[in-house]
């Protein structure tokens, strides 16, 4: 039995191994299987002379030197899988053949060749794979969404899947998360180290000023919130809508304009805005703009020069040829005429008509230009119903500028401003307009007579009394000063300028609002003559409550209640004294005014009834030429005594409390100027009202009948009027309609 088993085993070993592999039908096949994996070597002996066990041993034996070659251990990355349906049988056989050939060893070359021969001849299998029917190529393929002919899926399965739904709250949540993700965290800046012991005196002073500014702002907001239900809210705009048309015509279109209006229509505000815009326009050539006025007072208010000073004609009484020779000898005056492109004239109502004609002819001769005013653009303003020009001779009647022969050719448009800002009461504004025209109704006369009652206010301020002459003003103020007790403080102005002649310089500055010398006492009623802040403007009335330096004022602001009640601690007084001593040591030692000088502390009453304290320190007033040369300059505290004021100096001012005695009025327009300074009937007292004192020149009434509103500048064009013909031929906007007297006022 043992021999039979060995014999059977030997016969099985002599038979090829491939013959034992069953086929798909369950019958053992004699064909070779697919070759082994790459890198695995196996010895296959088809014929053997050894014993059966030896043949088995040699069939599975691995020599120790078979793996000495490193190439046998390098496994290559497999190729990407290719579907079997697309692989041809012949190619697969060739690849298998090459793989088997590369894995054979060199030591058994003959045996390997015989094995390959057998595998190549016996690889054909009995398995029959089904062949798919051939598909002809389609030249016109249908859309990707169409159903395939060989597929059972509906066409909807081949469409692009719909986007997933998103609920609203999920979308909102995603947005919030996205915003948080995009926000980049920032490391907070390290706060600057504050060392109170390591600050300079100037830094401490700036901090104190900032603290005072914040406290004042908070108090103002508190006052406004407490009074907003009792006081009407005033909305004051720098430039009103109708005034913007004038500003555009002057700055953008370069037209020569004369704009006028009753008292309180914003002529001064509009003129300042025009000057500002023109200087911005010619900022590279500042000497192209000449800012002038008919009087020194008006010139100081707009920081310009008088018209006579600009022209270089002195009094201007000589004939034009002599004046031209005089100007040509003065190189500066000649250059001013040649360089000027825009000439601004304020308060033209006091410019004589003959002088206007002389200036127009001088401009044409000096500039050698035949156009009106030698091609210079004119910006003129004033109210001819107010103070008239002063005639040269006593027997000669005053001649207004609009009566000059060159007025109509030099001025392209004459504009009337009708919106009144100063008087918020329509009834009071109508009363003033009737007085302006010289046509008083019985009702208006009775209303003015009822204003003779005394003014009663619950504070220490009195109404400012207006007088026609300067002597009356000085007498009234001196009498009131004599009634006050206490020390008199004198403040002298510091004058300077390019004019070395002291007398001539003082003559120029004599018309300035700031006096050369002013005497004040505690309790003096004063008026502010400089715009300081929004609520403290030119014309604000106040009372002097103390005299102190800047250091004391800082201490006063912090302890205002203690100052009022007279309660002080010795420590507080010592602290204030040390502060004054420290600042005094830092003062200038060059002979100028030191910071320890005491200045008047004034308590101003604002329109809403609140108080405002201001330490009035020196301000500057300049008389400046177009080229920037300052002919004269005055530094003085911005205050004047305000118990009494001249009508001439009051022109252009806005006063909350006014007292007028019309029995002393002697000139046309004086009554209207005096009464129109008031803002309401509650702050106006009129003594000895006489309708015969209300005098208006008939030529002025005739002139104002043919004026156009400012808004008509942007309306449609009409054929030009003879008196409004534009000499330079430029296309422009013409007057649309004539405004009747009743409609204008």
Curated annotation (Swiss-Prot):
Alphabetic keyword roster: ATP-binding, DNA damage, DNA recombination, DNA repair, DNA-binding, Helicase, Hydrolase, Isomerase, Mitochondrion, Nucleotide-binding, Nucleus
Annotated Pfam families: PIF1, Pif1_2B_dom
Similarity-based family: Belongs to the helicase family. PIF1 subfamily.
The organism of origin for this protein: Emericella nidulans (strain FGSC A4 / ATCC 38163 / CBS 112.46 / NRRL 194 / M139)
UniProt feature, compositional bias: Pro residues: 131-140
EC number(s) reported in the record: 5.6.2.3
Region span, Disordered: 1-39, 96-173, 180-199, 208-231
Main function: DNA-dependent ATPase and 5'-3' DNA helicase required for the maintenance of both mitochondrial and nuclear genome stability.
GO BP, sorted A to Z: DNA recombination; DNA repair; mitochondrial genome maintenance; replication fork reversal; telomere maintenance
Official protein name in the record: ATP-dependent DNA helicase PIF1
